[in-house]
Regions:
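Glycine-rich phosphate-binding loops of nucleotide-dependent enzymes
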Residues: 2-258
Length: 258
């Protein structure tokens, strides 16, 4: 069996004595879509911040691609191949779709400022390669109609798609999706669900997803972990989670049981 892409063991994180993450352990395997669910304030985003190096837990271990990443700075972890989208869109609104996607290539740029200024040799060749790669993302996410427009002029759902594309431009080995369909209408949600599955199945990128849309989670996830006040309740397949009495009572109720 392949080694886990990411693994947390007995992670504890507190702020001023308040437990944000309380004894969480899980692993994400190659090709897997692993979802984390729970109410607001359950510690889901804190777990993403632990994984990506924004927060350092007081206890526990965090491994990515077999390496201990506890204490590494976020840009170092990103350079290893961990990409992330956010609840709130974090794009440069005055830049075009293509320019925003190109920003995701920054860690793959191997030429200096002088070469870039002179636009010759290695800089020119690499720039062309990066643009070809970004154009493939435009095709993959069906962004052709907006490729040259400033992001600030685009509909919300398309902006979320651009943010997803920028994460893909990093060539991630693990993709963290923080509420990828928040605020979307039904059509946008269905489109995003399709792109997420294509990322997992066609690009073979494992995914950790935090999401409040229970229907989406149950349809897409291979496994789900449920947390409450930072404490894990259960981890299992969607079918197993749906049958867990504490999950039904506390979070899902009749939404998935009916």
């Amino acid at each position: 069996m392949s080694a886990p892409v990411a693994r947390l063991d007995d992670v504890h994180l507190s702020f001023a004595g308040v437990k944000a993450v309380n004894g969480v352990s899980f692993e994400v395997n190659p090709g897997e879509l692993f979802a984390i669910i729970g109410p607001n304030g359950a510690g889901k985003t804190s777990l993403f911040n632990v994984l990506s190096g924004v927060y350092r837990p007081q206890q526990g271990s965090v491994r990515f691609l077999g390496e201990d990443i506890l204490g590494r700075r976020p840009f170092r972890i990103a350079a290893m191949g961990m990409a992330r989208t956010f609840q709130n869109i974090a794009l440069f609104e005055h830049l075009t779709v293509l320019d925003n996607l190109m920003l995701g290539r920054h860690q793959h740029i191997g030429y200096g400022a002088a070469a870039a200024f002179l636009w010759r040799g290695k800089a020119r060749n690499q720039e062309l390669e990066h643009r070809r790669f970004v154009e493939e993302i435009v095709d993959f996410l069906e962004l052709e109609a907006w490729r040259s427009l400033p992001v600030g002029l685009l509909p919300y759902g398309v902006q979320k798609r651009v943010e997803l594309g920028r994460a893909l431009a990093m060539e991630p080995k693990l993709l963290l999706l923080d509420e990828p369909v928040a605020g979307m209408n039904l059509e946008e949600t269905e489109d995003t669900a399709r792109y997420i599955l294509d990322i997992r199945d066609e690009l073979d990128v494992p995914i950790i997803m935090v999401e409040h849309d229970m229907g989406l989670v149950m349809d897409l996830a291979d496994r789900i972990m449920v947390v409450d006040f930072g404490t894990p309740i259960t981890t299992g397949t969607p079918a197993e989670v749906q049958q867990h009495p504490d999950v039904i009572r506390a979070y899902l109720g009749e939404e998935i049981g009916s």
